[in-house]
């Protein structure tokens, strides 16, 4: 047990170094690829709780998202806004700016693919993140198709701090069987209750 725990800590530290993550981030082994990471984010971002409380939740997705970045948001009841494809092949930024204006009190999440696994188009991560954060929304980048080929940085620019990224190590050389990875800013997490109560979550349980 202790040996495996040390290996897991070393793996977390190595991933954090590669992705520019610091103490303000959590590296989470989520399970089955990026799909599991996104489903975990639905909980961590407090989406279902916000909807249950009557708060508007809007999720902005790109023109070429995988089902793993569509269905988790749709199934939780969020409003989905799909951006059109621009002439350059990425998401249409004029539509993005409009979609970010969801009204006072709304929870807005922008969830985009860093690279299309259909066209190979690579998004301008820093530019898009800058616009999203300036509007007060949360930014998720799905690197499932791009992680083996692209650099990943939680802050690609000083004014472009990404809230979360997900990727699928099973798509790397030697990666089959590896757990999906979610890296999330701790201050972006709205619901800290464990997704699955059980071993390792006892400190969250009340004595009553």
Label every PLM stretch briefly.
Residues 1-208:
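Pyridoxal 5′-phosphate
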């Amino acid at each position: 047990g202790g040996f495996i725990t040390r290996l897991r800590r070393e793996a977390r530290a190595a991933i954090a170094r590669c992705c520019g993550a610091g103490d303000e981030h959590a590296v989470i082994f989520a399970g089955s690829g990026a799909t599991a990471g996104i489903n975990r984010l639905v909980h961590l971002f407090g989406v279902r709780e916000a909807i249950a409380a009557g708060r508007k939740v809007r999720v902005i997705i790109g023109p070429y998202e995988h089902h793993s970045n569509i269905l988790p948001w749709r199934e939780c009841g969020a409003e989905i806004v799909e951006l059109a494809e621009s002439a350059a092949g990425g998401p249409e930024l004029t539509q993005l700016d409009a979609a970010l204006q969801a009204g006072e009190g709304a929870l807005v999440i922008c969830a985009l693919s860093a690279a299309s696994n259909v066209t190979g188009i690579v998004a301008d991560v820093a530019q898009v993140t800058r616009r999203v954060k300036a509007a007060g929304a949360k930014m998720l980048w799905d690197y499932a198709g791009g992680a083996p080929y692209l650099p990943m940085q939680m802050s690609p620019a000083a004014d472009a701090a990404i809230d979360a990224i997900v990727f699928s190590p099973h798509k790397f050389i030697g990666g089959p069987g590896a757990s999906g990875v979610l890296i999330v800013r701790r201050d972006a997490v709205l619901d800290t209750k464990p997704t699955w109560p059980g071993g390792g979550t006892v400190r969250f349980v009340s004595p009553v």
